[in-house]
């Protein structure tokens, strides 16, 4: 086998490979003979079909198959010999062929050489927080509101009330699409509507008709409404006040806490909040570390890896549409390109961190991750056993553990400063509610 390597552009490589033509001819001949023994063709006894007949019927397909196998086999031998690491599947193009040699060209991308830089320049502000009694009480108050019942009242609407309204919106005297509704139920103070709408309903009684002026935010999702001043003609049809359940042992039973009453519920709430806080703190630090790693390191990315990641993201997006996806056109690649590039770059850089630090997934950490996740379910042990008996799920958890270990390795050289934060403020930012 003769091999020549050519760098065409960036990470793309072109191998010109020449092998003895006999490799193909012998394999084709053997395959035709084997097919002749197996073939069942009218007019011929089983096993007695002439090779010439088989060649006429199947020769072209057999030769194509054998040629593909020969190219694949010799390509693998060539990249091993040349110490090349393909980042995607090659494309094969048969070249010049004579009685002596068969030549073909393989074009593919290789992984970039990654040399980590600026690890000591990564800056991380590590938040620290804890769940206080006040945080637990605030969560209980939230749960009370979620389990509130409502009854009609004859008074002015106030924050926390539920209002049933009809409304018609207009801009410069013209109604706009989506700006009209009847018997619309709105919880005042929920932040569901644009700023000024809910507060504009407060202070009015059922039966009143009134107008409010509001301005759509500059980042509003509808392009034609961004920054526009609108007038809403509103009819308040009913005001309902919330009746909150008392906080006692009966309240605890609403959440499946049969034994231990209210105190047991508080323990469970604190445990769940602490788990969520720990996950959010980890995610915050991880994002900072990865952002710093990306800023300090520029590497060329194989297009094959980006295309593959785009397809993964596209499939995930389509799955979220459920049954509607079948009637939708394929989502364009450029919707996912930026995210795909980031994921590929992070993967390559973290791979080098793992390699440099000789990291391997820690089994204890893997089990701790599974146990933490399982604790959110009704039967944690069942979830743990499910993971431990599922090879694919276990590999996913090993990858998560290995990524955590890589982030921790980067933290050792990063510039880290601690900052105390409040639970509610931090979690609101983490969940996008701030």
UniProtKB/Swiss-Prot annotation:
Compartments it resides in: Cytoplasm
PROSITE patterns given in the database record: FKBP_PPIASE (PS50059)
Name of a matching Pfam family: Trigger_N
Protein name: Trigger factor
Family: Belongs to the FKBP-type PPIase family. Tig subfamily.
Positions of the PPIase FKBP-type domain: 160-245
Cell cycle as UniProt keyword: yes
Reactions listed under catalytic activity: [protein]-peptidylproline (omega=180) = [protein]-peptidylproline (omega=0)
GO cellular component: cytoplasm
Presence of keyword Isomerase: yes
SUPFAM superfamilies xref list: FKBP-like, Triger factor/SurA peptide-binding domain-like, Trigger factor ribosome-binding domain
Keywords recorded for this protein, A-Z: Cell cycle, Cell division, Chaperone, Cytoplasm, Isomerase, Rotamase
E.C. number: 5.2.1.8
A single BP term in Gene Ontology: 'de novo' cotranslational protein folding
InterPro entries hit by this protein: PPIase_dom_sf, PPIase_FKBP_dom, Trig_fac, Trigger_fac_C, Trigger_fac_C_sf, Trigger_fac_ribosome-bd_bac, Trigger_fac_ribosome-bd_sf, Trigger_fact/SurA_dom_sf
HAMAP family named in the record: Trigger_factor_Tig
Domain notes: Consists of 3 domains; the N-terminus binds the ribosome, the middle domain has PPIase activity, while the C-terminus has intrinsic chaperone activity on its own.
GO MF assignments: peptidyl-prolyl cis-trans isomerase activity; protein folding chaperone; ribosome binding
Functional summary from the UniProt entry: Involved in protein export. Acts as a chaperone by maintaining the newly synthesized protein in an open conformation. Functions as a peptidyl-prolyl cis-trans isomerase.
């Amino acid at each position: 086998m003769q091999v020549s390597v050519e760098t065409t552009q960036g990470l793309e490589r072109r191998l010109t490979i020449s092998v003895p033509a006999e490799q193909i001819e012998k394999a084709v001949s053997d395959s035709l003979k084997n097919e002749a023994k197996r073939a069942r063709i009218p007019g011929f006894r089983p096993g007695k079909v002439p090779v010439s007949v088989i060649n006429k019927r199947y020769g072209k397909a057999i030769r194509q198959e054998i040629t593909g196998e020969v190219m694949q086999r010799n390509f693998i031998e060539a990249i091993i010999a040349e110490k090349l690491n393909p980042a995607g599947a090659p494309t094969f193009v048969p070249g010049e062929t004579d009685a002596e040699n068969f030549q073909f060209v393989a074009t593919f991308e290789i992984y970039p050489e990654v040399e980590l830089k600026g690890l000591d320049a990564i800056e991380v502000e590590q938040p620290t927080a804890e769940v206080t009694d006040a945080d637990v009480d605030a969560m209980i108050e939230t749960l009370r509101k979620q389990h509130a019942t409502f009854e009609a009242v004859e008074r002015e609407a106030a924050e926390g009330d539920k209002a049933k309204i009809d409304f018609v919106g207009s801009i410069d005297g013209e109604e706009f699409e989506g700006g009209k509704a009847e018997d619309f139920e709105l919880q005042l103070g929920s932040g569901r509507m644009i700023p000024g709408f809910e507060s504009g309903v407060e202070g009015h009684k059922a039966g009143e008709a009134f107008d409010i002026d509001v301005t759509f935010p500059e980042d509003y999702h509808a392009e034609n409404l961004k920054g526009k001043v609108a007038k809403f003609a509103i009819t308040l049809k009913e005001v309902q006040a919330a009746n909150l359940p008392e906080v006692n042992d009966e309240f605890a039973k609403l959440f499946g806490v049969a034994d231990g009453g209210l105190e047991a519920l508080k323990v469970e709430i604190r445990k769940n909040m602490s788990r969520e806080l720990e996950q959010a703190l980890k995610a915050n630090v991880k994002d900072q570390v990865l952002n710093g790693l990306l800023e300090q390191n520029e590497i060329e990315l194989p297009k094959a890896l980006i295309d593959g990641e785009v397809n993964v993201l596209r499939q995930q997006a389509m799955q979220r549409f459920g049954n509607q996806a079948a009637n939708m056109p394929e989502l364009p690649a450029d919707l996912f390109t930026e995210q795909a590039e980031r994921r590929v770059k992070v993967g390559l850089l973290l791979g080098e961190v793992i390699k440099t630090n000789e990291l391997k997934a820690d089994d204890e950490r893997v089990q701790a991750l599974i146990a933490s996740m399982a604790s959110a379910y009704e039967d944690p042990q069942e979830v743990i056993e499910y993971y431990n008996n599922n090879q694919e799920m276990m590999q996913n958890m090993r990858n998560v553990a290995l990524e955590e270990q890589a982030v921790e390795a980067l933290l050792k050289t990063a510039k880290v400063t601690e900052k105390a934060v409040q639970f509610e403020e931090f979690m609101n930012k983490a969940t996008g509610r701030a």
